[in-house]
Amino acid sequence: MLQSEGELVAPLIERQGIKNADYMFSAAKVIIELKILQTDFAQTTQTLEKVDELIAKHPGVDPDDPTEPLRRELLLLLRKPLQRVINTANRQIKETKRELGLHDWSGITVCVNDGFRSAPPDMVLGLLGHILAQTSYSNTDALIYQTNHYVELPYSPYANLLWYPTYSDPTNDGLVDFVNDLGRKWRQYSAKELGPFDVSEEYDSLDLVHASVVTGLRRKNRYTGP
């Protein structure tokens, strides 16, 4: 972030006990809070115990059937920890705006998925999208979902790192341009740190329905591209 003309917020906060956001970009009037998902929420002992309880509560029901209450209750288990993350980020952006008098600035939460790998990308994004749609986050104008692990796409022969932005107002061209530029700089930085990529592409839209987290050398789904 600092290599993209951003600066740390913390040194600018004078009062003690303020839970501030991480970065600010003065030229674009943007505040960014970075959240890293380090826990695999679906694999914690507490979650697994609750899953067993729900399955026992709904005997014989297919947990993958979207029409069944069991499916909705299972997804709710994963939604709750993600909602806590988004709630915290929104509050930190709000506190930063208030402390520094940046009331007309835009707020962005960058959600980096490092450890939550048991859920496919479309499920994580679906949960995040549902959270943002069902709750008022007046200080979060955009959310960027980024992966620190590789993702397999049926229509791509490569393992991919995702940078997937969503907006509360997609007609805010200035914010969209800023996010796109930040994404390009992130790709350049990643290529410098990790080595050159085989391909670096941008899409107006991305179908993640059959995307999956790369866990080994073999593909999970057949490559369907040209």
Question: Could you say what each language-model-derived stretch is?
Answer:
Residues 23-25, 30-36:
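Conserved catalytic cores of phosphodiester-cleaving nucleases, focusing on short active-site segments
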Residues 14-15, 37:
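Short, solvent-exposed coil/turn elements at secondary-structure transition points
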Residues 37-175, 194-226:
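Metal-dependent nuclease catalytic core centered on acidic motifs
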Residues 171-175, 179-190:
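Terminal interaction module
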Residues 19:
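Beta-rich catalytic cores
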Residues 1-14, 26, 45-50:
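Acidic-basic catalytic patches of nuclease active cores, encompassing PD-(D/E)XK
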